Amino acid sequence: MNRIARLVVLALVLLAGTAAWAQPAPAGKNLTVGILLVGPYNDHGWSQATYDGLSYAIAKVPGTKMVYVDKVNPADRPGTTASQLAESLVNQGAKMVIFNSDDMSDEAVKFATAHKDIFVIFLSGDTTWKEGKNFHDLPNMVCIMGKMEYMKMIAGVAAAMTTQSGKIGFLGPLINDETRRLAASAYLGAKYAWVNYRHQPLSKLDFKVTWIGFWFNIPGVTSDPTQVADDFFNSGYDVVISGIDTTEAVAEAAKYQAKGQTVWAIPYDYKDAINEGRGVSLGVPYFNWGPSIAVAAKAAMNGSWKSHWEWNGPDWKNINDPDKSAVGFNKGTLSKDAGAAVDKFIAELAKGLNLWKGPLNLQDGSQYLSSGQAATEKQIWYLPQLLEGMQGQSVSK
């Protein structure tokens, strides 16, 4: 074999090796999809939204079936890691594994690296975003997130149009880039409605964030979200926007209203979380994971899979379209004026209204966006602090 021929053979061998890692073999006509849920599958919040999203995909994509493990967190499963539990899904036949929490980031990367033949979806992550801060070259992984920022803005509008005291509380989970930007989005929506729809001075809007320390209550570890919600209501905050995975805010609002106190709440994540407090829930910003998971499953089956990062927005023709919109807002008990304001705001967003535009300062007074400057995706995704005008911690102590 001459030198040129040897080089050609070597190149083909290297290419074949690269291709094997570049894309797992297509699953073909049948695909078992496993999902790891950080909380209970029926938590009426984040985990149920992702569980239902996969259920939607299974119903839409012939040849697929589902296996799952829930309560994947240190409190419920001490000494057990997410990657170990992912192994258990593979042992049940899973050729695709979904990690459903930002808290699983390191474990998702560890598992994907060790299982190059398994398709991996990391919900809410950025590890496959080439321009992001946490990029890993993982050809078998796709990261998916919905642009919840829009829906949190809508929640802020609903809160600002409803509050009688001008005091809005935000019940936050742990502090990270995601939770900062979502709390800030709610503030931006509230600020916009307070000034432009209610024509009130911004100085009279009180927006306070209290973090509990995790996505849901872990007795003895986190602050109790029930107590935090109560503290808001007992301190004159008459609307509480939830940023945690579970429904304590709206449950407490219902209790307070039953005792004669006029308060409201806005749950999160799951479309039907609104049912936890009929009459006190102003609406719920929710994720609709099904369509994007269905697309990923089809790609894994037919060989069109490519590693990428996606940050999916709403379908502005109908933000609640179950087959097209990645995020939505399920309106609740809103006054006529508040409901009209929410509809008006959604229409403005659909036409291009951008609240992530300067002038905007960070909480410490430093400039975030100059006048007229629109934030980039990176500036929003990696928001380093809360915004000026918001009360509460910006970083973990």
Report each predicted region and the residues it spans.
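Bacterial N-terminal signal peptides that target proteins for export
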Residues: M1-V9
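Bacterial N-terminal signal peptides
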Residues: V8-A19
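A residue-level marker of the well-folded mature domains of exported/periplasmic proteins
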Residues: Q23-K397
